[in-house]
């Protein structure tokens, strides 16, 4: 059954899911305190990994993927005309959760869930580019930024032009949130995976 829904409502549904701060909740439940007080101060899986608990970081990653996927799936199932805006809402919710003073994560994992929700081709392109760029550069931020740009191109390639504007907005947001990483890249100071900063 399909309904017509105002795009802003679809975006709010996405935001509600995306703004669940799994990284913060899991680290607190595990007795590790506030993950925002370490590393980058973000609530995503990469910063949770800095606690030294790989299992907790992996669980955060999975749940961040799920919270991107679920609102897009709901939009596919019930609101066929508002899928892209549910996707945008989910990433915005993760990056700027109202409950945490609009300071969340950088959105790469949540956007992966979003992309798989938008279509397997888009999701696989996202994952492929992320993995290839990580293998080549061993720099997580480069892999993430490359993947978000590739997602918009993949949406166009797979015949989903209505998904391109939300994915472009998402790419701009995520790249902007990586501005400190970009500055370190330009200085040659961005840490590589497997190396201590």
UniProtKB/Swiss-Prot annotation:
Reaction catalysis annotation = an acyl phosphate + sn-glycerol 3-phosphate = a 1-acyl-sn-glycero-3-phosphate + phosphate
Which subcellular locations apply to this protein?
Cell inner membrane
Q: What does the record list as GO biological process?
A: phospholipid biosynthetic process
GO CC annotations?
Answer: plasma membrane
Superkingdom as given in the UniProt entry: Bacteria
**EC number(s) in its UniProt entry?**
2.3.1.275
Transmembrane ranges, per UniProt, are 7-27, 56-76, 82-102, 116-136, 157-177
Q: Cross-referenced InterPro entries, in alphabetical order?
A: G3P_acylTferase_PlsY
Enumerate the UniProt keywords alphabetically.
Cell inner membrane, Cell membrane, Lipid biosynthesis, Lipid metabolism, Membrane, Phospholipid biosynthesis, Phospholipid metabolism, Transferase, Transmembrane, Transmembrane helix
- Entry keyword Signal: no
The protein's matches in Pfam families, at most eight in alphabetical order, are given as: G3P_acyltransf (PF02660)
- Record keyword Glycoprotein present: no
Q: What pathway is this protein said to act in by its record?
A: Lipid metabolism; phospholipid metabolism
| GO MF terms, alphabetically ordered | acyl-phosphate glycerol-3-phosphate acyltransferase activity
Q: What is its main location?
A: membrane
Give start-end of the signal peptide.
none
Q: How does it sit in the membrane?
A: Multi-pass membrane protein
Task: Summarize the protein's role.
Answer: Catalyzes the transfer of an acyl group from acyl-phosphate (acyl-PO(4)) to glycerol-3-phosphate (G3P) to form lysophosphatidic acid (LPA). This enzyme utilizes acyl-phosphate as fatty acyl donor, but not acyl-CoA or acyl-ACP.
What does the similarity note say? Belongs to the PlsY family.
Quaternary structure?
Probably interacts with PlsX.
Q: What is this protein called?
A: Glycerol-3-phosphate acyltransferase
Per the UniProt entry, what species is this protein from, by scientific name? Erythrobacter litoralis (strain HTCC2594)
Encoding gene per record: plsY
């Amino acid at each position: 059954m399909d309904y017509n829904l105002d795009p802003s409502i679809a975006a709010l549904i996405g935001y509600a899911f995306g703004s669940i701060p799994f990284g913060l909740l899991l680290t607190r439940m595990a007795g590790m305190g506030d993950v925002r007080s370490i590393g980058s101060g973000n609530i995503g899986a990469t910063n949770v990994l800095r606690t030294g608990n790989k299992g907790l970081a992996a669980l955060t990653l999975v749940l961040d993927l799920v919270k991107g996927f679920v609102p897009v799936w709901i939009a596919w199932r019930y609101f066929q005309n508002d899928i892209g805006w549910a996707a945008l809402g989910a990433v915005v919710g993760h990056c700027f959760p109202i409950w945490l003073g609009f300071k969340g994560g950088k959105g790469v994992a949540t956007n992966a869930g979003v992309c798989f929700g938008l279509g397997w081709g888009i999701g696989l392109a996202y994952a492929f580019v992320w993995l290839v760029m990580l293998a080549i550069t061993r720099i997580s931020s480069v892999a993430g930024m490359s993947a978000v740009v590739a997602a918009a191109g993949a949406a166009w390639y797979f015949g989903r032009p209505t998904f391109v504007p939300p994915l472009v907005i998402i790419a701009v947001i995520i790249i902007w949130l990586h501005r400190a990483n970009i500055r370190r890249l330009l200085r040659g100071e961005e840490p590589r995976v497997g190396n201590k900063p």
